[in-house]
Amino acid sequence: MSVALPIPETVRSFLAHSHGLLIDGAWRAAASGQTLTTEDPATGAVIGHIAAGGQVDVDAAVRAADRALRERAWRTMPPPERMRLLWALADLIERDAEPLAFLESLDNGMPLALARFSVAGAASSLRYNAGWAGRISGEVPTLSAPDHHAYTVYEPVGVVGAIIPWNLPLTMAANKIGPAIAAGCTLVLKPAELTSLTAIWLGELVIEAGFPRGAVNIVTGRGAEAGAALAVHPLVAKISFTGSTATGQAIASAAVSTLKRVTLELGGKSPVFIFPDADLDAAAVGAANGIFLNSGQVCVAGSRLYAHRAVFDRIVEAVAGHADALSLGPGTAPTTQIGPLVSAGQKQRVEGFLADGLRDGCTYVAGGGTPEGPGYFVRPTVLAGAQPNMSVYCEEIFGPVLTVMPFEEDDLEALAARANDTRYGLAANIWTRDISRAHRLARLIDAGTIRVNGAGIDHALPFGGFKQSGWGRENGREGVLAHMELKSIAIRF
């Protein structure tokens, strides 16, 4: 296993402090005085302390956001000024890119290369959404009454409660802040308790960028306390949540009490299809990267691989070889290609699925088990023999576990029916040179995002899921509109 780099002095200095909550433009301790520890998942060692915000702190943060929203300076701020704030924040992220990437890797376990990519993605997300400030406009419809004139306008929905997961913390924070500010909202950001450190650093940059007091508030703490309080607060107009389907269901239920607007980006069990005419080398690498990236802790991870029988053995051998060749180690080690899972609990969850799979009749093609030593590592694993009634086939594992299944039918409807036999519908990947086939299969798959031949996900593309993979869309124009209300104004003259 590779050896971690020494912690840079800037990061070491940051970790030496016990971090508070950003409320109304200033840092404060939690009202309870309680703190939470945060660990390096590569070793299990405590690396820092964060404030354990609770209901009282959430209330203070929401009220600060509500005051900021209603202040004339924010209500009348020209859209180019909101754009400038988001660009300034993106510039500061890029300035601090290296310490942020190291901190993200240390806190989450992801390899440094991925952490650097994630930090860059956070900056680009803010810049993309900044471009929408001032570009959302209403319409002037033609009315039936000749002496009437009417128009529509979009207005900010209000205070946004943004709850983010632990798998890509900084990117997720930026994805929530950008569209909310572009739309003219204020917000309270609640990071995952396991990975709050880069969100706290981001809070310092929010202050430095010149955001008005209360426009962006950050409350760390347990989801069952701080997150739950945010979901039911009467002054929160919208909840934007990314995380598990189970937690999303609980948040949706809580939000019903005040009929909040809700956007949910939830779990997935995404299929990957490889046809004989595909670029098989590229498809095998794409399938491997699609499940083993960030140790499989990605919502769109391609965790079910369907390869045509004619190329099945070749594809499975290539993907298994890729899995076995990956270098495990601490995320902060320069040679690491796959880091630890985020926590002991997540490791136990993945190990439980693997045990269930073996008990149900699956066999290891690659990986399996955990290496000796400290940390929350699980070897990248390829399982054969999975059936639709098995948990490894139908449940989101959120770990480096791929099930492989052959298909023989040329009937795309039958193939799509197999893939759609799940409660999830977030994404899918298709590998074929037959573009007609790709279009036809893409239309048959119940998923919000379909990628063909390794196409990427862009900030301009609306992103979200079908079925129990979520409500609404993030990214693109739709992502900004999700933070706005549409008002109709009619005038008789």
Provide a role label for each language-model segment.
Residues R67-R70, D91-E98, G109, G131-R135, ...:
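Generic secondary-structure signature for well-ordered alpha-helical cores
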Residues I47-S137:
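Glycine-rich loop-to-alpha-helix module at the N-terminal edge of alpha/beta enzyme cores
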Residues A45-G48, V236, S327, R359, ...:
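Conserved C-terminal structural/oligomerization subdomain of aldehyde/semialdehyde dehydrogenase
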